[in-house]
Swiss-Prot record:
Domain Integrase catalytic: 979-1138
Source species: Schizosaccharomyces pombe (strain 972 / ATCC 24843) (Fission yeast)
Binding site for Mg(2+) 2: D990, D1050
SUPFAM superfamilies on file: Acid proteases, DNA/RNA polymerases, Ribonuclease H-like
Occurrences of domain Reverse transcriptase (ranges): 436-615
Protein name: Transposon Tf2-7 polyprotein
Length: 1333
């Protein structure tokens, strides 16, 4: 080991921690002892021997080496073996033959007679030493045994693991597994391979040393220093602005890289000095390349120092016609859009042609991948592998032949052939020749035959299949069930070792029942043939094959085997029992003469890919190729492509939170009545889905021995649940998620019934897990009353509850209450609807009839008939029977009834208004909305213009107007405040309250410069006075930055006090107050407060009572972050330099810090331009969310929002949503209005309101003249006037509000309501005005 490499490994060893290696296991005790001996006595580097020197000199040095380390070479056998391992291959074979002929030869005599010796470095010696070891290692036990036997210090232990262990495992089959698990070893091997590449691979050296500067340059590295920015992150060497290795020469060229999946090309730097592929963020955005987080955060430096925390998925790239698949690290800036590293070139066997400035791919003759061998312990089953078997006609197995039963015998299929190009013709001839040779097909005389077609295989070849679609129409279905994926995965619980078997040409292993061959005939240009084995493409083949393989495997399928079609997975809990399990399965396959495809089999693995999932001891996740399929999907161009995309997403839905919510905008496009129009909403939906798949969750295997927790919840429209289990770390991990829509009847359930429904549906969904558990499992619900309903032994309230309680008796559970705020997962799932679950058309429960039927009395009939006489059309129907028959109208009890059993009424009469009022105000439904009220009335009545009349009535209902919130977009565009000319001229101020007490403080005074965005944070108390605030502002702001010109603040009593007014006059600044209840006026301070609160949570969330200690750090962090509005940091704008933020940095000073310098003036001008641009963007974004302003005129009646403005608001959830109505006096600004408030509250509230807090009060005296809620009328002070409407007397009264006793209000009410409130005053008014009541 060279000194430089030793220093590097020493630095690596210091950073290594034992948790990076969980350990190793092996039964080879001799290997453990040997490793321990080497570790106990660390062997230093003895130098590299030149094989061209004389043998005696080498023998002398080797003898000295053996003498210095007797523990490693205790006998002649170990010395001789060490010597043999250091000979060239031919010389080694020669020496071994000599030793077999003469066993008494010493190691010195072997060297002398062999004549040629290969010297090597320490790494090669270690490789040779353990070259004979071929068994797969389990890390955990191996390292534990090694540590216990080796008596050595911690540093040498790490050094051994990092340096010696990878080399000793170099020829092991699972070498890549180690590299992926041990990041230190991976990084080290990458560096070593890169460093030695130029020496060991001559073909990468440029052939022409006089290269053109325009395309290929040759550079010499001038430094060996390594600028590592952090010691706890992955190491990537770099020089200038590129990832470089500093131990060899570097060559560059630029080529156009084609990305066929994204239909684009990008200029790409081919850099043999780079160790990583990189791509810029701009390129990723421009071509919408999918990325994912990268767990190894890397600092790269040079011209563009930054942190890399994302990389692309593996992309298909074409370079000079050479196709490769690789991934890129995403960087902010780089000299080229992308760069391909040396490592990628090496891994893909690509060389640079320096004379032609192109790339070429060498034939990998020496790297041909051999078919994986059957492990030695299973050699007895070698005769069932595809390598020892050619496809031949299998023997029929009684009872398992493939039967084809048809629904009718006399059928004819269309006679046609699909046209085939020459390439497919050759493939067809090859397949038919092979089929005839093996006997699986034969020529046929059948009169019905199906055409052939070709589908591509994974490896790129073509497979001939028959298009049996015409025949499938006449084939009787096979009802044998295919296994459910979820139930298959559940059987794997507790297993730690897996073997996967794949059957070769699985369908062709089953014979067709004699006499059914002609039914499977197919035609092609060569003629008509028929299958003697089960073919691909026929509809009943999958079900029959599942029955076939289940029967073959028999009882083993229930214990340690799961199979889905031709995919067989054997799982065990230990190595010893796994061997037995695998042999059992192989014996079953051998008895049935089945053949396995050895190339696709995997033996004794800790993790495998099976039916689309990555399965391990911990749980299962989707395979990366399925995720990549979604991540690489481009924008769908039509409904077919969109359905294909949603199909891929639906396969992964159990790993995607909020699937239904995310796919909702996409599903809308698939509706029949929706026109295809792709908008940014759909684009964002696809991007959100892709982001969820970047890091999918791991779902744990269900374990019947672990504690079970079921959390359920119900929303208005759906139910949700999460099933979890408690593991060894006392934490609950999810087993699965569930959510489902409610049916139409279930939507009408009470809250308790909906919560009960969530439990019932969840138990049904996971019944195979939860039924008959030995120990009770826990159910958590956020509905306290539900516990009593379930545990109550009294008579059930209804039949539905009785059925549910009977169903619950099959389960052993305990139910507990937990608030909804804690039950957040199930609560969220109940609001995410599984749109794939069918909703039954007819529910077992009858929906509640909400119709408040109006009694059809004789008086009502007479009133209707009277109204008929005033309507010409209805009167004609009443008197003309032929006309009634023509329009399908019946006459019952004097009433006209249409085909929908609706009573026909004249339009817009006193009768219709009475009906609307009855249903809206006096029915069992409380003030229903327009749609609901219309649907209810239409069940019994109809008339012309019914919808319009109902809409007008509801919109003018006083109770609805003041109590129901509005769902429209807010009124009023944003009016940004223009920026000032320089820092600290215009400020904004506010307080952050409700902070935990820290060092005697419980609030924070925030001052923000509106120009630079710099913030000053001063701890204070909630009870601070105006005088204290003025002193604090003087000492912390004015003393450092001078007098401001203006300050914007809210209407806090401190800033409106006389003390503060005197303070403002003293320092000559103007106070401007934000509009009451309109935070957008001072949005800057609001956003600053939010950012400060987030930063405080980051630094003291675990110890919140220490926040005062972190204020200076939070202020520094905020003021040194680039602000989106100015594109600079507040500190840099004010002080004209950037401070040092860590010991590794130096401050960058500007030569011109004078505020009157040309540079400063230019900076201020740039900042102002950025602020103006930002204001325009904010206004554009904000105005997108508002609707056109409703202009109010003086004299209009409006209502004021209570809850958002605080106006006349009490902390009472049942208080009305709006106050009023009030008259508009005038318009006092672009979006502000002054209202005529009662004298009693004018001193309490500002009379000016923003338009977004106002709603127009609709009042139609013909419908309902009352303008105030009768429950709000307290003591009547005075009656102003009266009016008669529809034989009802209305009074305009001034009264004391019940909701706000200190408030005097006025409005219209009925005589009956006024009499209930104050009979004496009302009677006096009637008497004085001579009213005839």
């Amino acid at each position: 080991m060279s000194y430089a490499n030793y220093r590097y490994m020493k630095a690596r060893a210091k950073r290594w921690r034992p948790e990076n290696l969980d350990g190793i296991q092996t039964s080879d005790e001799h290997l453990i002892n040997l490793f321990a001996k080497i570790l106990s006595k660390h062997v230093p580097e003895i130098g590299k021997f030149d094989p061209n020197k004389d043998v005696e000199s080498y023998i002398s040095k080797l003898d000295q080496h053996f003498t210095e380390y007797p523990s490693l070479f205790p006998n002649e056998h170990t010395k001789r073996q060490y010597t043999l391992n250091h000979l060239e291959e031919l010389e080694q074979q020669f020496a071994e033959r000599m030793f077999s002929e003469n066993g008494s030869l010493t190691w010195q005599e072997l060297l002398r007679q062999t004549g040629k010796v290969q010297g090597s470095n320490k790494g090669d010696r270690l490789t040779k030493t353990f070259e004979g070891f071929r068994n797969q290692l389990d890390k955990v036990q191996f390292i534990r045994k090694l540590m216990s036997k080796a008596n050595v210090d911690d540093f040498h232990t790490r050094l051994f693991i990092l340096w010696m262990l990878p080399y000793s495992l170099r020829k092991l089959k699972e070498r890549n597994y180690w590299k992926s698990e041990i990041s230190e070893i991976y990084d080290f091997l990458e560096d070593k391979r890169t460093a030695s590449y130029g020496k060991t691979h001559k073909r990468f050296q440029p052939q022409n040393k006089n290269l053109g500067k325009e395309s290929l340059s040759k550079k010499n590295n001038t430094t060996n220093s390594r600028n590592l920015r952090k010691t706890n992150v992955s190491r990537i060497e770099y020089s200038s602005n590129k990832f470089l290795n500093h131990t060899r020469k570097r060559y560059e060229m630029v080529l156009q890289a084609e990305l066929p999946d994204f239909k684009c090309s990008i200029p790409c730097l081919i850099d043999t000095g780079a160790q990583a592929n990189i791509i810029t963020e701009e390129t990723v955005r421009a071509h919408k390349l999918p990325t994912r987080p990268w767990s190894k955060s890397v600092i790269y430096g040079g011209v563009y120092p930054n942190k890399i925390n994302r990389k692309t998925i593996k992309l298909n790239i074409s370079l000079n016609g050479i196709s490769i698949k690789t991934e890129f690290l995403v960087v902010k800036k780089f000299s080229h859009p992308a760069a391909i590293s040396f490592t990628t070139l090496y891994d893909n066997n690509i060389e640079i042609s320096s004379s032609k400035h192109t790339l070429s791919q060498m034939n990998k003759v020496s790297n041909i991948v051999k078919e994986p061998e059957l492990p030695d312990i299973y050699k007895e089953f070698k005769d069932i592998t595809a390598e020892t078997n050619t496809e031949k006609l299998p023997k029929p197995i009684k009872g398992l032949e493939f039967e084809v039963e048809l629904t009718q015998e006399n059928y004819r299929l269309p006679i046609r052939n699909y046209p085939l190009p020459p390439g497919k013709m050759q493939a067809m001839n090859d397949e038919i020749n092979q089929g005839l040779k093996s006997g699986i097909i034969r020529e046929s005389k059948a009169i019905n035959a199906c055409p052939v077609m070709f589908v591509p295989k994974k490896e790129g070849t073509l497979r001939m299949v028959v298009d049996y679609k015409p025949l499938n129409k006449y084939v009787k279905p096979n009802i044998y069930p295919l296994p459910l994926i979820e139930q298959l995965l559940a059987k794997i619980q507790g297993s730690t070792i897996f073997t996967k078997l794949d059957l070769k040409s699985a369908y062709h292993l089953i014979r067709v029942r004699k006499g059914d061959e002609h039914k499977l005939a197919f035609r092609c240009p060569r003629g008509v043939f028929e299958y003697l084995v089960m073919p691909y493409g026929i509809s009943i083949a999958p079900a029959h094959f599942q029955y076939f393989i289940n029967t073959i495997l028999g009882e083993v399928k229930e214990s340690h085997v799961v199979c889905y079609m031709d995919n067989i997975l054997i799982h065990s809990k230990s190595e010893s029992e796994h061997v037995k399990h695998v042999k059992d399965v192989l014996q079953k396959l051998k008895n049935a003469n089945l053949i396995i495809n050895q190339a696709k089999c995997e033996f004794h693995q800790s993790q495998v890919k099976f039916i689309g999932y990555h399965i391990s001891e911990k749980g299962f996740t989707p395979c990366q190729e399925n995720i990549d399929k979604v991540l690489q999907w481009k924008q769908p161009k039509n409904r077919k492509e969109l359905r294909q995309f949603l199909g891929s997403v639906n396969y992964l839905r159990k790993f995607i939170p909020k699937t239904s919510q995310l796919t909702h905008p996409l599903n809308n496009l698939l509706k029949k009545d929706v026109r295809w129009k792709w908008t940014p909403t759909q684009t964002q939906a696809i991007e959100n889905i892709k982001q969820c798949l970047v890091s999918p969750p791991v779902l744990r295997h269900f374990d019947f021995s672990k504690k079970i927790l079921l959390e359920t919840d119900a929303s208005d429209v759906a139910v949700g649940a999460v099933l979890s289990q408690k593991h060894d770390d006392d934490k609950y991990y999810p087993v699965g998620y569930y959510s489902a829509k409610m049916s139409k009847a279930q939507l009408n359930y009470s809250v308790s019934d909906k919560e009960m429904l969530a439990i019932i549906k969840s138990l049904k969904h996971w019944r195979h897990y939860l039924e008959s558990t030995i120990e009770p499992f826990k159910i958590l619900t956020d509905h306290r009353n539900l516990i009593g309903r379930i545990t109550n032994e009294s008579e059930p309230e209804n039949k539905r509850l009785a059925r549910w309680q009977l169903f619950l008796q099959d389960f052993n559970f305990e139910i507990n209450y937990r608030p909804g705020s804690a039950n957040h997962i199930a609560d969220a799932l109940s609001r995410i609807v599984d749109e794939t679950e069918p909703i039954p058309k007819d529910s077992e429960d009858n929906s509640i009839n909400f119709v408040n039927q109006i009694s059809i009395t004789d008086d009502f009939k007479n009133q209707v008939v009277t109204e008929y006489t005033n309507d010409t059309k209805l009167l004609n129907l009443l008197n003309n029977e032929d006309k009634r028959v023509e329009e399908n109208i019946q006459l019952k009890d004097g009433l006209l009834i249409n085909s929908k059993d609706q009573i026909l009424l004249p339009n817009d009469t006193q009768l219709t208004r009475t009906i609307i009022k009855k249903y809206h105000e006096e029915g069992k439904l409380i003030h229903p909305g327009i749609e609901l009220l219309t649907n209810i009335i239409l069940r019994r009545f109809t008339w012309k213009g019914i919808r319009k009349q109902i809409q007008e009535y509801v919109q003018n209902c006083h109770t609805c107007q003041i109590n129901k919130s509005r769902n429209h977009k807010p009124y009023g565009p944003l009016q940004p405040i223009p920026p000032s000319e320089r820092p600290w001229e215009s400020l904004s101020m506010d307080f952050i309250t409700a902070l935990p007490e820290s060092s005697g403080y419980n609030a924070l005074f925030v001052v923000v410069d509106r120009f630079s965005k710099m913030a000053i944070l001063v701890p204070c108390t909630k009870s601070i006075t105006a005088e204290q605030t003025a002193r604090m502002f003087d000492q912390r702001v004015i003393a450092y930055f001078g007098n401001p010109k203006e300050i914007i603040a809210d209407n806090d009593h401190i800033f409106t006090s006389q003390t503060w007014k005197d303070f403002a006059h003293k320092y000559n600044f103007v106070m401007k107050f934000s509009l009451p209840y309109r935070p957008q006026t001072d949005g800057q301070t609001e956003r600053t407060n939010q950012t400060v609160e987030k930063l405080l949570r980051c630094v003291c969330s675990t110890h919140p009572n220490t926040w005062v200690d972190h204020i200076s750090l939070v202020q520094q962090s905020y003021n040194n972050a680039i602000h989106s509005a100015t594109q600079m940091t507040p500190f840099e704008i004010v002080h004209r330099y950037s401070p040092a933020l860590s010991p590794l940095e130096l401050p960058s000073f500007s030569d011109k810090t004078d505020e009157n310098s040309q540079e400063t003036i230019q900076v201020f001008q740039t900042v102002k331009e950025h602020l103006n641009t930002n204001n325009i963007k904010m206004k554009k974004y904000f105005d997108m969310k508002i609707q056109e302003i409703e202009e109010f005129q003086p004299g209009d009646l409006v209502m004021v929002k209570r809850t958002k403005t605080g106006f006349l608001h009490k902390s009472n959830k049942l208080a009305p949503s709006f106050a009023g109505p009030f008259y508009v006096l005038q318009k006092s600004g672009p979006n502000n209005y002054e209202l005529d408030l009662p004298d009693s509250i004018k001193h309490m509230f500002s009379s000016t309101f923003h338009v977004s807090h106002l709603e127009k009060y609709r009042h139609n005296s013909e419908l309902n003249y009352a303008t105030i809620d009768e429950s709000d009328i307290g003591t009547i002070l005075h009656i102003l006037e009266h009016k008669n409407r529809e034989q009802v007397l209305y009074l305009n009264v001034k009264y004391i509000s019940n909701l706000n006793p200190s408030t005097i209000m006025s409005g219209w009410t009925t005589l009956a309501t006024a009499l209930q409130a104050d009979k004496a005053i009302v009677n006096d008014y009637i008497k004085n005005n001579n009213l005839n009541i």
